[in-house]
Amino acid sequence: MTGFRDQLGVHAQALVLRETRNNLLTSNIANAATPHYKARDIDFGAELARASGTGTLRTTEARHFAVGGPAARGEALYRDPVTPSLDGNTVEMGVEQMEFAENTLRYQTSLALLNRRISGLMTAIKGE
């Protein structure tokens, strides 16, 4: 028998990560005029793999290197600008708005899939 969390699949984890990414992107947009502000983001694919356990690497020998770094620990990374500004701010409004719109659409999709999954579970529980 599997647990409730297993029944929700990856959608619940994706929803949490999309919300985290949305917060970072809105912070970037809000600080577009702040001198020396560095735009931040997460590597969604890597974070989802880490959260779902599919991205773990196994070492088979003592001489293997451990994988680390900010992305492996779930930290926000700084984005390198295509055209840096003179005041040191790395926010590129067009990039941020596009990433925000895409992330919001994917958040809504994950939410709809999660709602459908929960509705299916409720139907199974009620025996309808």
Swiss-Prot record:
GO biological-process terms attached to the record: bacterial-type flagellum-dependent swarming motility
Domain of life of the native organism: Bacteria
One GO cellular component term, please give it.
bacterial-type flagellum basal body, rod
Principal place of residence? other
Q: Which UniProt keywords apply?
A: Bacterial flagellum
Do the record's keywords include Cell wall biogenesis/degradation?
Answer: no
Where in or outside the cell it occurs: the entry states:
Bacterial flagellum basal body
Subunit comment: The basal body constitutes a major portion of the flagellar organelle and consists of a number of rings mounted on a central rod. In Gram-negative bacteria, at least four rings, L, P, S and M are present, whereas Gram-positive bacteria lack the L and P rings. The rod consists of about 26 subunits of FlgG in the distal portion, and FlgB, FlgC and FlgF build up the proximal portion of the rod with about 6 subunits each.
Q: Could you say which protein family the record assigns here? A: Belongs to the flagella basal body rod proteins family.
Briefly state the protein's biological role.
Answer: Structural component of flagellum, the bacterial motility apparatus. Part of the rod structure of flagellar basal body.
Report what the protein is called.
Flagellar basal body rod protein FlgB
User: What organism is listed for this UniProt entry?
Assistant: Cereibacter sphaeroides (strain KD131 / KCTC 12085) (Rhodobacter sphaeroides)
